[in-house]
């Protein structure tokens, strides 16, 4: 099924980065005519060169510096719940090959075809940070797709990232699902931690530090460890589990 979207055009020469794989077009690269300026933030658009060559489908925000974010290089792409589910399924399959337990960064924004969206999975809970107007309009479909593809019971849509303000979004958060209270377990490198997905920093846990925690743990056997600005205690507890003689964690 073909989908018709409003059209925006790039200024002459502005197509080079997009044609070489960059996923964004900045506001000063787009011919901001009256029709483009009138589009609602987050609208799906067909993006073209100045001479009408099709470059794909993007989400568009005329009020943002990053005005267009490419969703697909196919001009015929349909962006709906089915498309979102396919992208999340692909992301899940990739992560399940890397990790033996379902505790990981499920979606890495543009890298997984979800511009401005980060999703962390804590077994049957997922935390989703939606930082673009286009993805905000699809937030319920994203949550549904995550639940359908992973089987999680709750999806927390966190809206407290300051990046959202650049897109004209508010800071409200909500839970899709039966709800939850308090902390959740995080299993990483054989150690069970606790994280607060509702009000902890960002999604409640820094999965990008997994390898660094594992590296520090290798050095910890018999050592005295000081973990300053410990937050959830990820580094200190990893060292303790690896045989550190003494661990001091400091935060405020």
Language-model regions: role of each:
Residues 125-130:
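Carbohydrate-binding surface patches
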Residues 80-87, 134, 138-142:
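Short amphipathic alpha-helical segments
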Residues 178-252:
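Rossmann-like S-adenosyl-L-methionine
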Residues 40-43, 65, 151-152, 222-223, ...:
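Short coil/turn connectors at secondary-structure junctions
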Residues 107-120, 136-206:
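Non-catalytic substrate-recognition/targeting regions of SAM-dependent transferases
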Residues 1-122:
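Non-catalytic accessory regions of SAM-dependent methyltransferases
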């Amino acid at each position: 099924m073909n989908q018709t979207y409003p059209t925006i055009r790039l200024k002459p020469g502005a197509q080079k980065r997009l044609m070489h794989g960059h996923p964004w077009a900045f506001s000063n690269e787009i011919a901001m005519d009256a029709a483009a300026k009138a589009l609602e933030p987050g609208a799906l658009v067909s993006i073209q060169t100045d001479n009408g060559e099709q470059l794909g489908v993007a989400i568009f925000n005329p009020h943002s510096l990053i005005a267009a974010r490419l969703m697909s290089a196919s001009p015929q792409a349909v962006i709906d719940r089915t498309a979102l589910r396919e992208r999340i399924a692909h992301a899940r399959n990739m992560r399940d090959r890397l990790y033996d337990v379902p505790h990981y960064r499920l979606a890495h924004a543009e890298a997984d075809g979800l511009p401005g969206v980060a999703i962390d999975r804590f077994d049957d809970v997922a935390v989703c940070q939606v930082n673009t107007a286009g993805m905000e309009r699809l937030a319920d479909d994203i949550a549904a797709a995550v639940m359908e593809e992973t089987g999680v019971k709750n999806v927390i849509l966190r809206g407290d990232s300051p990046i959202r303000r650049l897109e004209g979004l508010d800071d409200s958060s909500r839970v899709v699902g039966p709800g939850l209270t308090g902390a959740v377990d995080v299993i990483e490198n054989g150690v069970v931690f606790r994280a607060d997905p509702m009000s902890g920093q960002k999604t409640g846990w820094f999965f990008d530090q997994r390898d660094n925690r594992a590296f520090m743990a290798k050095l910890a056997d018999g050592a005295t460890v000081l973990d300053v600005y410990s937050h959830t205690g990820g580094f200190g507890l990893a060292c303790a589990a690896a045989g550190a003689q003494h661990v001091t964690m400091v935060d405020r």
